Amino acid sequence: VGETTPQYTDFQDDGKYSWLKSPTFYGKPMQVGPLSRVLCMLAAGHEPTKKYATAALDLVSSVAGAKVGLDAMHSTIGRHAARAVGCAVQCDELAKQWDLLVANMARGDLKTFNRPEFPKGEQRGVGFHEAPRGVLSHWVVIDSGKIKNYQCVVPTTWNAAPRNENDQPGAYEASLIGNPVADPEKPLEVLRTVHSFDPCLACAVHVVDQENKPVVTVSAV
């Protein structure tokens, strides 16, 4: 767990400051999202993922007239293909979840949420979730039922991370290394590659007061 210390003063043409954090897993930057999910599920022997990933690669192989293996997934179009594979797997799972929901309702279980109960005093928690763009994590400090501190590390934080203190590039930068560009004046290949991660601009937007004064106050009734 690190601490974010903003260094921004004003806009500078020569500056290379990024508002994004540089999260690491065991000291290394990570790519998150559909491709990561598909590769991890294949490594875990998940049969539905294997079924649809194999079908996708077989289809591409027939169109290309040559065998296209799993290594081809590490590419711009591979990330889009992984997104389609993931959607197919999730559609099958959704049908199963729907049947389970209907069965629960038939037994009289109509609950839609669990009402939260917070003990008195300071409580700390963290939650991880696999969102469509990739892994999403939230950290929170709650004091007597009120949020005292909150931080998110979202999928785009991982993928768009700038180089860290060990000079390790984030996923965007790493994916662009060696990427051919037909026209340097119109580097559409760069745009296409970054778009394949489905970037979220809001994930790098923050409102900060340099003197640590409250920026906005919200009253919840």
Language model features by range: what are they?
Residues 1-221:
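Metal/cofactor-centered catalytic core regions of large enzymes
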